[in-house]
């Protein structure tokens, strides 16, 4: 049985947000990310956000759009609301000064703090009997989600249904990264990025006891197999991005330091409305041979439990 979507959306409905919000969104757990995207969907990004506007998100809409069961949608709505309510966006440097001018905050280039944390949600309420969640964005977050078009600020555009259906953190973050480049440079279907910067975009890192960043997957073949190839497979399966590929762009000695990503965005042939059957990666013969040998040498880790 198909669930009926009550929201005024379709498979080409877009959500938009300024690029400064990307890192925060990439860090959000899946339930919080889905709640955030559902709240962004009805916003007219060309216009200012109406003061006092409250957004209502129905579990049945989330289930239908994300292609998950109603029971899971109910759980994620409640869990995601709590997580999103505790989430913040952190700004540094010029981003603080720019926001200070927009919102009349008491900061200038001379007295700017090192970091500024902003709450995303002013309040959030869950009504379990009726199966919906209500929330209100803070005033400080409004410049990042409304009045975007026609201004010099760069923003990222994603398809709502595609962003909701990606279930892996790495898939979601890589999809957002590709859409950022596509949104800002529509005539370019590629971008070059360092491996370290890519891991930061994908949140593939932790911090040591001294607060220093430690990147995950130091061995590139494992990063390629367990992160990039799997993320690309899900993106091609569930989004409007019909092709994603990457090649080594630069090395430092024998170490791979930069990658070149190429992609094709085809919003007219959105693949997210296909049935969710098992899917396989389309690998070149060379990649397939490499991965076969590599898997025999370094078997993938099995899930515990």
Swiss-Prot record:
InterPro entries: Initiator_Rep_WH1, WH-like_DNA-bd_sf, WH_DNA-bd_sf. Keywords: DNA replication, Plasmid. GO terms for biological process: DNA replication initiation. Signal peptide: none annotated. Disulfide bonds: none annotated. Changing residue 162 to S: In mutants COP21 and TRCOP21. The keyword Chaperone does not apply. Homodimer. The expression of PI protein is autoregulated. This is PI protein.
